[in-house]
């Protein structure tokens, strides 16, 4: 199948479901667009049926068995169940309302093929159709979505139409409102699906063709078709059929919402309807972006209003329905990189589509909450369709490329939510006499009665006095009677033309009326507005003026196709066969006359096209000549057909003379003669116009030839002037040659200087990088030196404390020794004196002496330990001093290298100045002007000096800061707090520099603090729970999901509350 994936996939888990009927998930239509307007405003009454309220007459009956737990992704929150939709029929009497059981919107997905740009970019296929009702993710197979139908990249638009739109069109012809619209991101294929082109028509042309085919197949009913075409551009409604209808307003009455002042046109054939679309497309707003050269910048709504009633005496009321074909503009992201007006347009498009998503989300919740239909013009016009008062078919166009993964996923989520909206479609019927088709039918019958009375000689509304005056006039003279008869004939002719025009506006199937005459529908290739009595030719010219040059050729091709139909159907053989079968009835005769009029209209249309091509042939006469010749051949062919029809009318008139009365025969002959005279006169006018156009074409060709001759003469004069210049003085040539050689040498020198300049710039950048590395190493060394200085100061403090303590201990030791010596001396003296006196207890004295000797040993040991500790500290201090000296040497070496780099940089700037001076000197030789380059050199030298001074000053400041830091680090411990503060200050300066760089990098993106929906207001809201800071206040209140991660918003934090 065309919609299945090109690769082998696992069978869909939904393959067990029964296939739905053509009305499966049938969509509802908006009966409230321009719509909900059953009739023109002048004919609407309060008694008309209100579609928005659901009080409609007639319905279709349908039994549905549906089990849907959820429309979310499979493997996620829920799955789809089986669906069964039996055949349905239309049931309902006048004045009754029979509603069907609940159904859902029909949702189809169409994949477009990957573009050449995506292949070149290296994109891969991420989303693919699995079977014919499933969309699955390549990298996460559990993420899948089920819909009514999924079409692959190789599918065609007719296949999409047969599934998504044809059931809606068929139901609309039976009285049920219908809406078909395409949804997707920019460049996903929405406009191609809805409009198509000449080779591959889209949904709208196929639907129009299908409508007229159904009319042709439906016997016993009369149809009246009207169309309107509008766009919503920047939340402003514009009428595309009427360029003056700008900024229209939406109104409401008992029938629902409608657009005030919208223009409605009666259409008679598919070509006629397509001509209005082509004329409207000329006024539609389009623009270019990064993805599409002609991107739609507005939403368009093409509405086909259908009225039908039973033919003849079987009238049972008028059935009214509307078919809305909508082409939505694509949602845009920051990838489009639009600015100015395009960004403003994208903001309005995103707001309307965001509101549409919010409305669909509210409708799928199933709660009695407020639905914000009035937040956008689009949702207000789609209110009745989304509320479920008709069939709705949603066609989602997506791309499988990996670069649009999130956009495709969001589109699939939108389609999944829309699938859960329930609808209750019903058949519409108008029982009153306010329908336009009924008004036309009554007027036709009244005019026919008046014509019969005129034929019988009975004037309606003529009093007895008027009859007496007529008798007196008859007696007065034959001349007055003749004038009166002529006036009556004119009145008859006017009534007949009025009847014919009103009859033409009503489309009736000709399947069983005249065999061999009409194939599909009456070939009314004309543009006629409802309620206007202008002539057919002028109306044709008006509709032709609405079309653009681009659409003229397509309309001309339609006219050629219709003329080919007439050629096949109205051949002389067929006419002779029909004449041999029997005498034509008056209705058949009138039908032939209508054919003649239609051919005259087509001839006028071709003539206007020929005029436009002649005007365009001034730019390209060769290519336009073939088209002009083809149009002339078509006009001659139509003239031949008109002559054959007139001959057929004449033959049928001769055949009917024997069976008609003399008065009727005379009237017919007079009428036919008048018509023939008119047609001959029109043919003469057309032939005269053709001759004039040919003469104009010949004059244009002669003028073109004259211009070619003038160009040739000018070229000859130019060559002669060149030859004259080549014969100038030899000295001048030599001087010029010398100058050229000098210029070439200067150019060569300039190229060399440029190369040297490039090399110097590269060397400069390398030196800068090296200088930066050295600066980093110097800063690191300085930091180490400062740390070592602090540690050295701490050690010096400790050594000082220990030396003071040692000195104190030495003093105590000396004092203790002195004290011990004095005590020992006294003890010895006392012992000697005591021994001498009485010899008392020497042992005790020995113990005291022993104790004193023990204390002295302990003090000596402690003093030695302290001396050893002092020696260790002095060694550590010496080591610290050595390390500090090494760091100082490294810092001095870094300074020397930095100074050398600065000198090299200054020399490079001098070299650059010299190069600039040399370049300016070369330019001065070429221009022979020495004053200005000298000034430029001076300015360059001044700039270089200023830059060198600035660099030196900056380096001096940096060196000064470093010297201050080192000096502070080498000071006494009294300035330790100052060193700490300086170190903290340097750390703060580094942090500020890093923050400024981060801020500059953040500000590089102009859209980083701009709302991701409207692209206008700054971001002011933090979304919870994802905590993304990406929306302004108004857009955050309107959104239900985060535009970045698509998580549901539970709460909002406003960063800048008012």
From Swiss-Prot:
Question: Transit peptide residues?
Answer: 1-60
Keywords of the record, alphabetical order, are: ATP-binding, Chloroplast, Coiled coil, Metal-binding, Microtubule, Motor protein, Nucleotide-binding, Plastid, Transit peptide, Zinc, Zinc-finger
**Which segments show compositional bias classed as Low complexity?**
23-49, 824-838
Chain residues that bind ATP: 184-191
Q: Does the keyword tRNA processing apply?
A: no
Q: Which Gene3D superfamilies match?
A: Kinesin motor domain, Zinc/RING finger domain, C3HC4 (zinc finger)
Q: Which ranges carry the Kinesin motor domain?
A: 104-421
Disulphides: none
GO cellular component terms, alphabetically, are: chloroplast; microtubule
For region Disordered, the annotated ranges are 1-92, 549-578, 824-847, 922-946
Amino acid composition bias (Polar residues), ranges on this chain = 50-70
Question: From start to end residue, where is composition biased (Basic residues)?
Answer: 8-19
Looking up InterPro entries in the UniProt record yields: Kinesin-like_fam, Kinesin_motor_CS, Kinesin_motor_dom, Kinesin_motor_dom_sf, P-loop_NTPase, Znf_RING, Znf_RING/FYVE/PHD
Q: What protein name does the entry list?
A: Kinesin-like protein KIN-7M, chloroplastic
């Amino acid at each position: 199948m065309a919609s299945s994936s090109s690769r082998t996939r696992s069978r869909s888990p939904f393959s067990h479901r029964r296939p739905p009927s053509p009305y499966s998930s049938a969509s509802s239509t908006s009966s409230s667009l321009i719509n909900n307007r059953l009739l023109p405003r002048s004919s609407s009454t309060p008694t008309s049926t209100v579609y928005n309220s659901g009080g409609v007459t007639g319905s279709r009956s349908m039994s549905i068995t549906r089990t849907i737990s959820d429309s979310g992704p499979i493997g996620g929150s829920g799955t789809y169940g089986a669906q069964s939709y039996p055949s349905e029929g239309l049931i309902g009497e006048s004045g009754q309302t029979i509603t069907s059981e609940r159904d859902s919107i029909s949702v189809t997905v169409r994949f477009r093929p990957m573009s050449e740009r995506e292949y070149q970019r290296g994109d891969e296929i991420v989303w693919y159709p699995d079977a014919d009702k499933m969309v699955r993710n390549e990298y996460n197979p559990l993420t899948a979505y089920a819909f009514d139908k999924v079409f692959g990249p190789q599918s065609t638009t007719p296949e999409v139409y047969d599934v998504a739109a044809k059931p809606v069109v068929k139901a609309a012809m039976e009285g049920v409102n219908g809406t078909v619209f395409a949804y997707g991101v920019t460049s996903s294929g929405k406009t191609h699906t809805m409009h198509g082109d000449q080779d591959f028509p889209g949904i709208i042309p196929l639907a129009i063709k299908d409508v007229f085919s159904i009319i042709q197949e439906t016997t016993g009913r009369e149809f009246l078709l009207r169309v309107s075409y509008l766009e919503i551009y920047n939340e402003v409604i514009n009428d595309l059929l009427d360029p003056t209808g700008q900024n229209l307003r939406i109104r409401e009455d008992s029938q629902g919402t409608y657009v005030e002042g919208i223009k409605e046109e009666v259409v008679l054939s598919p070509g006629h309807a397509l001509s209005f679309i082509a004329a409207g497309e000329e006024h539609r707003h389009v623009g270019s972006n990064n993805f599409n050269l002609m991107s739609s910048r507005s939403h368009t709504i093409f509405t086909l209003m259908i009225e039908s009633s039973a033919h003849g005496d079987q009238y049972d009321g008028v059935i009214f329905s509307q078919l809305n074909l909508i082409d939505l503009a694509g949602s845009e992201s920051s990838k489009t990189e639009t600015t100015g007006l395009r960004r403003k347009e994208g903001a309005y498009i995103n707001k309307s589509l965001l509101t549409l998503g919010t409305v669909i989300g509210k409708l799928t919740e199933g709660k009695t909450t407020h639905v914000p239909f009035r937040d956008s013009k689009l949702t207000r016009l789609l209110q009745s369709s989304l509320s479920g008062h008709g069939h709705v078919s949603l066609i989602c166009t997506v791309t499988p490329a990996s670069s649009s993964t999130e956009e495709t996923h969001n589109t699939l989520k939108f389609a999944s939510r829309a699938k859960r909206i329930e609808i209750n479609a019903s058949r519409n019927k108008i029982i009153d006499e306010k329908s336009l088709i009924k008004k036309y039918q009554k007027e036709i019958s009244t005019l026919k009665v008046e014509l019969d009375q005129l034929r019988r000689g009975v004037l309606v509304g003529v009093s007895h006095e008027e009859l007496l005056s007529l008798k007196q006039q008859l007696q007065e003279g034959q001349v007055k009677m003749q004038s009166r008869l002529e006036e009556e004939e004119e009145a008859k002719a006017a009534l007949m033309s009025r009847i014919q025009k009103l009859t033409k506006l009503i489309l009736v199937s000709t399947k069983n009326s005249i065999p061999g005459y009409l194939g599909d529908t009456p070939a009314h290739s004309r543009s006629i507005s409802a309620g206007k009595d202008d002539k057919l030719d002028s109306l044709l010219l008006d509709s032709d003026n609405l079309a653009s040059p681009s659409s003229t050729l397509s309309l001309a091709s339609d006219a050629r196709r219709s003329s080919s139909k007439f050629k096949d159907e109205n051949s002389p053989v067929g006419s002779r066969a029909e004449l041999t079968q029997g005498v034509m009835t008056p209705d058949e005769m009138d039908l032939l006359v209508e054919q003649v009029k239609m051919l005259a209209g087509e001839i006028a249309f071709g003539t206007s096209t020929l005029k436009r091509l002649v005007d365009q042939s001034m730019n390209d006469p060769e290519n336009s000549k073939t088209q002009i010749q083809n149009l002339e051949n078509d006009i001659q062919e139509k003239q031949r057909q008109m002559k054959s029809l007139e001959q057929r009318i004449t033959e049928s008139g001769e055949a009917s003379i024997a069976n008609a009365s003399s008065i009727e025969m005379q009237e017919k002959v007079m009428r036919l003669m008048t018509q023939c005279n008119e047609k001959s006169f029109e043919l003469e006018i057309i032939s005269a116009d053709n001759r004039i156009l040919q003469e104009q074409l010949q004059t244009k060709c002669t003028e073109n030839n004259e211009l070619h001759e003038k160009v040739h003469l000018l070229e000859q004069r130019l060559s002669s002037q060149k030859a004259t210049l080549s014969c100038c003085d030899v000295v001048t040539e030599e001087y010029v040659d010398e100058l050229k050689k000098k210029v070439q040498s200067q150019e060569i020198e300039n190229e060399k200087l440029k190369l040297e300049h490039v090399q110097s710039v590269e060397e400069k950048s390398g030196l800068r990088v090296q200088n930066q590395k050295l600066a980093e190493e110097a800063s690191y060394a300085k930091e180490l030196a400062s740390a070592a200085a602090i540690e050295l100061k701490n050690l010096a403090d400790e050594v000082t404390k220990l030396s003071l303590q040692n000195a104190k201990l030495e003093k105590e030791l000396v004092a203790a020794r002195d004290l011990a010596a004095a005590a020992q001396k006294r003890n010895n003296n006392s012992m000697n004196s005591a021994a001498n006196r009485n010899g008392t207890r020497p042992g005790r004295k020995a113990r005291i002496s022993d104790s004193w000797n023990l204390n002295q040993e302990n003090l000596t040991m402690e003093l030695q330990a302290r001396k050893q500790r002092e020696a260790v500290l002095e060694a550590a201090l010496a080591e610290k001093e050595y390390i500090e000296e090494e760091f100082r040497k490294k810092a001095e070496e870094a300074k020397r290298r930095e100074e050398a780099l600065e000198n090299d940089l200054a020399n490079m700037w001098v070299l650059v100045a010299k190069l600039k001076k040399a370049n300016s000197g070369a330019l001065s030789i070429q221009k022979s002007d020495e004053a200005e380059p000298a000034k430029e050199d001076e300015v360059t030298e001044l700039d270089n000096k200023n830059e060198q001074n600035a660099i030196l000053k900056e380096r001096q400041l940096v060196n000064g800061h470093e010297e201050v830091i080192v000096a502070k680090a080498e000071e006494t411990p009294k300035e330790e707090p100052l060193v700490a503060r300086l170190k903290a200050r340097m750390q703060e300066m580094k942090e500020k520099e890093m923050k400024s760089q981060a801020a500059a990098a953040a500000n590089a993106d102009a859209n980083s603090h701009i709302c991701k929906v409207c692209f206008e207001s700054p971001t002011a809201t933090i979304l919870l729970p994802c905590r993304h800071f990406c929306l302004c206040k108004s857009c955050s209140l309107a959104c239900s999901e985060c535009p970045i991660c698509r998580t549901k918003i539970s709460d909002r934090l406003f960063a800048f509350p008012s």
